Amino acid sequence: MAATVNLELDPIFLKALGFLHSKSKDSAEKLKALLDESLARGIDSSYRPSQKDVEPPKISSTKNISIKQEPKISSSLPSGNNNGKVLTTEKVKKEAEKRPADKMKSDITEGVDIPKKPRLEKPETQSSPITVQSSKDLPMADLSSFEETSADDFAMEMGLACVVCRQMMVASGNQLVECQECHNLYHRDCHKPQVTDKEANDPRLVWYCARCTRQMKRMAQKTQKPPQKPAPAVVSVTPAVKDPLVKKPETKLKQETTFLAFKRTEVKTSTVISGNSSSASISSSVTSGLTGWAAFAAKTSSAGPSTAKLSSTTQNNTGKPATSSANQKPVGLTGLATSSKGGIGSKIGSNNSTTPTVPLKPPPPLTLGKTGLSRSVSCDNVSKVGLPSPSSLVPGSSSQLSGNGNSGTPGPSGSTASKTTSESSSSPSASLKGPTSQESQLNAMKRLQMVKKKAAQKKLKK
């Protein structure tokens, strides 16, 4: 039996040697195929008893070992000419035996249930080893394919292989290209349509696979469709569009009214004052004027040029603005004190003026230290402040107060002061009430009016 095995194995061993020493990549696969062929052919006769013996109890395993040892001994016995070959073939044979023997043992231990049936049925004993051998051959192929598929699956799971061909091989013109949407890898040749060089090599371009581009187009179409669907309902939408148009002017009007408060409404009310000189109409127009800080700002801003307003009144009557302004500047607390002591100055002014009744109004406390506090009392009371104001400068103030209403002060200042009082007091005032915030605002507006008149006169002179 050993001799027959040797005769059959010699050419196969030679082939195996050639495959062992060859440097080609396919040599390992060919060696494997050769081993499978040799097992499928006549060598299986040497393995058949071993398989039969391995299936029964342990005693048969000793027989199996002895049978395996026989071919080794017989292969080492041939003549000296073949000694070198035999030694090398022995190594190959050992390696070839180790692999299938180990796999056979593992297969047989796993598939013990399968060979139990042939033991019971004697006629099938011959065919049973064949089935076992076929099962032995199959696991070899299955294992190799399992290893390959597991590697491929691993590569696929890691996203390293092409989705179409399931390979990681990369050629110069066939690189792996990644889709930016689904992050699948495609070979340039595997993808349909094929990926161009520009798409593959240009890092600025974002590449999408054909499937993702289709999906994105569908999504874009879906997003474009919704505005087209409610087209028949445009009729119902139009009134909603009209409503804001109707509402807009209302809101604008509201904004205008609110903004006018900050645009100083006294500008408009001053026109009312110029038209109607009666204090009743003025008080009604002032009610919509400024209050709080804005009113205070109006007072302070208009308080400064109040002396210039006096000079403007004198310009209307006489062409001497400089003297009156010079005399009116130093009016301070002394002028206020003289005006508040009694109605003497006011009475003197009233003798010269057309109005017999002049109300006595103390100034608001905020403008005490300013130069225009004589004006801030009211335009009607200029007579009482205008007359005692020269008393701070001129020594003949006692004669002015004790006089019978004529200008007792020497120089042009007294005459100008009397003129200012007569001009300013000509406007009748029906308000005999105490000073209120509205009246102070009235005074501020009158001052503004005077400033405007003066500016217009200056422009005309120029």
Swiss-Prot record:
<feature type="region of interest" description="Disordered">
    <location>
        <begin position="301"/>
        <end position="462"/>
    </location>
</feature>
<keyword id="KW-0597">Phosphoprotein</keyword>
<dbReference type="InterPro" id="IPR013083">
    <property type="entry name" value="Znf_RING/FYVE/PHD"/>
</dbReference>
<comment type="subunit">
    <text>Component of the Integrator complex, composed of core subunits INTS1, INTS2, INTS3, INTS4, INTS5, INTS6, INTS7, INTS8, INTS9/RC74, INTS10, INTS11/CPSF3L, INTS12, INTS13, INTS14 and INTS15. The core complex associates with protein phosphatase 2A subunits PPP2CA and PPP2R1A, to form the Integrator-PP2A (INTAC) complex.</text>
</comment>
<dbReference type="GO" id="GO:0005634">
    <property type="term" value="C:nucleus"/>
</dbReference>
<keyword id="KW-0832">Ubl conjugation</keyword>
<feature type="compositionally biased region" description="Low complexity">
    <location>
        <begin position="347"/>
        <end position="358"/>
    </location>
</feature>
<dbReference type="GO" id="GO:0032039">
    <property type="term" value="C:integrator complex"/>
</dbReference>
<dbReference type="InterPro" id="IPR051776">
    <property type="entry name" value="Integrator_subunit_12"/>
</dbReference>
<dbReference type="GO" id="GO:0008270">
    <property type="term" value="F:zinc ion binding"/>
</dbReference>
<dbReference type="GO" id="GO:0160240">
    <property type="term" value="P:RNA polymerase II transcription initiation surveillance"/>
</dbReference>
<dbReference type="InterPro" id="IPR019786">
    <property type="entry name" value="Zinc_finger_PHD-type_CS"/>
</dbReference>
<dbReference type="InterPro" id="IPR011011">
    <property type="entry name" value="Znf_FYVE_PHD"/>
</dbReference>
<dbReference type="GO" id="GO:0034472">
    <property type="term" value="P:snRNA 3'-end processing"/>
</dbReference>
<feature type="zinc finger region" description="PHD-type">
    <location>
        <begin position="159"/>
        <end position="215"/>
    </location>
</feature>
<keyword id="KW-0862">Zinc</keyword>
<feature type="compositionally biased region" description="Polar residues">
    <location>
        <begin position="301"/>
        <end position="328"/>
    </location>
</feature>
<feature type="compositionally biased region" description="Polar residues">
    <location>
        <begin position="59"/>
        <end position="86"/>
    </location>
</feature>
<feature type="cross-link" description="Glycyl lysine isopeptide (Lys-Gly) (interchain with G-Cter in SUMO2)">
    <location>
        <position position="68"/>
    </location>
</feature>
<feature type="compositionally biased region" description="Low complexity">
    <location>
        <begin position="382"/>
        <end position="437"/>
    </location>
</feature>
<keyword id="KW-1017">Isopeptide bond</keyword>
<feature type="compositionally biased region" description="Basic and acidic residues">
    <location>
        <begin position="88"/>
        <end position="124"/>
    </location>
</feature>
<protein>
    <recommendedName>
        <fullName>Integrator complex subunit 12</fullName>
    </recommendedName>
</protein>
<feature type="compositionally biased region" description="Basic residues">
    <location>
        <begin position="449"/>
        <end position="462"/>
    </location>
</feature>
<feature type="cross-link" description="Glycyl lysine isopeptide (Lys-Gly) (interchain with G-Cter in SUMO2)">
    <location>
        <position position="254"/>
    </location>
</feature>
<dbReference type="InterPro" id="IPR001965">
    <property type="entry name" value="Znf_PHD"/>
</dbReference>
<comment type="function">
    <text>Component of the integrator complex, a multiprotein complex that terminates RNA polymerase II (Pol II) transcription in the promoter-proximal region of genes.</text>
</comment>
<feature type="modified residue" description="Phosphoserine">
    <location>
        <position position="128"/>
    </location>
</feature>
<feature type="region of interest" description="Disordered">
    <location>
        <begin position="42"/>
        <end position="132"/>
    </location>
</feature>
<keyword id="KW-0863">Zinc-finger</keyword>
<dbReference type="InterPro" id="IPR019787">
    <property type="entry name" value="Znf_PHD-finger"/>
</dbReference>
<dbReference type="InterPro" id="IPR039054">
    <property type="entry name" value="Int12_PHD"/>
</dbReference>
<keyword id="KW-0479">Metal-binding</keyword>
<keyword id="KW-0539">Nucleus</keyword>
<dbReference type="GO" id="GO:0160232">
    <property type="term" value="C:INTAC complex"/>
</dbReference>
<comment type="similarity">
    <text>Belongs to the Integrator subunit 12 family.</text>
</comment>
<dbReference type="Pfam" id="PF00628">
    <property type="entry name" value="PHD"/>
</dbReference>
